Curated annotation (Swiss-Prot):
It comes from Sinorhizobium medicae (strain WSM419) (Ensifer medicae). This is Dual-specificity RNA methyltransferase RlmN. GO terms for cellular component: cytoplasm. Signal peptide: none annotated. GO terms for molecular function: 4 iron, 4 sulfur cluster binding; metal ion binding; rRNA (adenine(2503)-C2-)-methyltransferase activity; rRNA binding; tRNA (adenine(37)-C2)-methyltransferase activity; tRNA binding. The lineage of its organism: Bacteria, Pseudomonadati, Pseudomonadota, Alphaproteobacteria, Hyphomicrobiales. Disulfide bonds join 139-384. It is found in: Cytoplasm. It catalyses: adenosine(2503) in 23S rRNA + 2 reduced [2Fe-2S]-[ferredoxin] + 2 S-adenosyl-L-methionine = 2-methyladenosine(2503) in 23S rRNA + 5'-deoxyadenosine + L-methionine + 2 oxidized [2Fe-2S]-[ferredoxin] + S-adenosyl-L-homocysteine; adenosine(37) in tRNA + 2 reduced [2Fe-2S]-[ferredoxin] + 2 S-adenosyl-L-methionine = 2-methyladenosine(37) in tRNA + 5'-deoxyadenosine + L-methionine + 2 oxidized [2Fe-2S]-[ferredoxin] + S-adenosyl-L-homocysteine.
Amino acid sequence: MSMAATETLNRTDIAKAPQVRLAAQPEKPSLIGLLREDMAKLLVEKGVPERQVKMRVSQVWHWLYVRGVSDFNEMSNVSKDMREMLSAHFTIARPEIVEEQVSGDGTRKWLLRFPPRGAGRPVEIETVYIPEEGRGTLCISSQVGCTLTCSFCHTGTQKLVRNLTAEEILAQLLLARDRLGDFPDRDTPQGAIVPAEGRKITNVVMMGMGEPLYNFENVKTALLIASDGDGLSLSKRRITLSTSGIVPEIYRTGEEIGVMLAISLHAVRDDLRDMLVPINKKYPLKELMEACRAYPGLSNARRITFEYVMLKDVNDSLEDAKELVKLLKGIPAKINLIPFNPWPGTNYQCSDWEQIEKFADFINQAGYASPIRTPRGRDILAACGQLKSDSERMRKVDRLAFEAMMIANHGED
């Protein structure tokens, strides 16, 4: 896919989109990302009578998560005095869109900017929308940067700056629904590739920047709100949390959140996984597999997804495939084989396609679904393992080298 296939929307283009209020006063606490009981406490503190607070919370909740408003003045069934009080003390603003890119395959990537909140300067993260036939998946970030330093992952080369708040995690979903026309009274961008019917965002995956389970409480709150039946109403079976293997929090995820689980596996031996996914030194494969087997509600209809990036001459032999089948014995599982997505400066290469197919065939014959993930958004660095904030990338990456690499990969997808 050539660089010409990529469309970058600048600030002028963004201004033409449905207008949402930006965070001009970040010092105000946001009502987004609060559980009902926490929102109720704040409203009572600001003078809302106890006898009214349940009704007021329900009203605000509906406007935030069903109607998708970003301005208190749009809450038409809330009294003027109440709206003025809310505006004076709180915000429901969206993050700033620094840049929006649209890949030739319809994948969209947003670079979003949030307030510093202890980081010393505003921070930026990336959120990616992947349209497919009959579904649209939003890939959400949980941290600014990452601590895990997985050797094949571009995000891992950006040091952790801070965790995202529950508000900032949810804001990615709210903003994407704004931009895609997935709220009432919002228009879908002309020419956008989205599902023909129903919701534009049908699935959410916590597979963006960061390790979600190192930000457990904020991720938990955000996902419980996203799956609330009176709001955004995403089924927990359509929310997938991907982890590199933080074993104690895997148990907590099953008990306290209950969404689908994905494991960034990538190797079947501890020595190799120690190198590819260094958290394995703390939580080795035996402990990780025990946590997976104990995950609540597992069945053939509710499987754990194991992600396995295909690295040439590293982890792609048939012997690796045999060991993978042994490792997953007794776990209802699907194995996503991911052709390695190149990024500037990496020493890894993608496995040959013929080898990937042989690997997949062996796993299929052993009884496991093993789809080969179609690379999406490579031309805008939106594919798996490529996310990294633009401000960080531009300081370290030679743009000409990147463009030369992408031209060399033309036609691969």
